[in-house]
Amino acid sequence: LSAEIMERLKPHLQLAETVGLLVSQLAGGHVKEMELRLQGEFASHPSQPLVIAALKGLLSAGLGDSINFVNASLEAKARGIQVLEVKDESSRDFAGGSLQITTRGDQGSRSVTGAVFADGDLRITSIDAFPVNVTPSSHMLFTRHRDMPGIIGHLGSLLGEHNVNIASMQVGRKIVRGDAVMVLSIDDPIPADLLQTITAIEGIQ
């Protein structure tokens, strides 16, 4: 691809890599299949660079800086990850289209959708089909929980007790008192022992 096209694709490649990294961390275990769905305007872009960027993000969660745009496809193949690609130009969920990555593996299926807004900002727009509006950041905490009183307050208090500062928070749900997701952007990484305490909170899955 020409340098001009690659420059135009730059925010879309960043989104694909970011979404790949996020969905990999949510999936846990061994990922056997990655499905990349390009919707709306995204479907009109060359797909191969987006596939490679998504794989780079997906694999970098476990392999770090050793994964790059040159070896991402080879590493995915070596690990037996099947790659599926779907294009849907008719989708009009966002003006600039969207990109969804779904993984399937040992611990089930997880999906994250993102979009590039007009000003070039990257946004996460859904997690496992729960609607959110999240700007990706360096340190994020995701929870899947029951939509019931007390859980958000309990988690916020727990983070405060451990001097973890919350920069922003988003909650997505489909029905009242059903399941929900919460996304917190925080200033620092969460220690492993605190993460274990969080997962033990009643109502957090």
Put a short name on every predicted segment.
Residues 2-205:
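A conserved regulatory-domain signal marking ACT and ACT-like small-molecule sensing domains
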